[in-house]
Amino acid sequence: MHLALYRKYRSATFDEVISQEHITTTLKNQIKAGTPAHAYLFTGSRGTGKTTCAKLMAKAVNCLSPVDGNPCGECESCKAIAAGCPDIIEMDAASNNGVDDVRALRDEVMYAPTVCRYKVYIIDEVHMLSSQAFNALLKTIEEPPPHVIFILATTEI
């Protein structure tokens, strides 16, 4: 059976991400300083590590004992995220691109995280959202509650 490399191997730390040092250094510095932004936009071709960096960032901002900006992988939060913590929400905008999908997400944003410090919404292929869906999401992205971080990933600008 053929497995894509990104499915077989996904970096566990920012240091393991290949050819994105300028990005991973910036993200690690934000973790070390304790100043994560409320929203990020990751752009690039397929296979450049957008989703990997988004998942690492979700883990790192919630890690209780980060190591040089990397998630430790051993604390309660890291283990919960690895096990599928409900505070890390990944949405494939290619499949969930309607205004009703975004409204459901927007309603969910107001609830505090259950396990982690932050709820992180990773919206992959964000360019696939309909214009109505993106308009419904815009205000929430611009002014999210303090416990929410959005990471948008796209292959198009």
Regions found by a protein language model. Name each.
Residues 1-157:
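P-loop/Walker A NTP-binding region and its immediately flanking N-terminal helices
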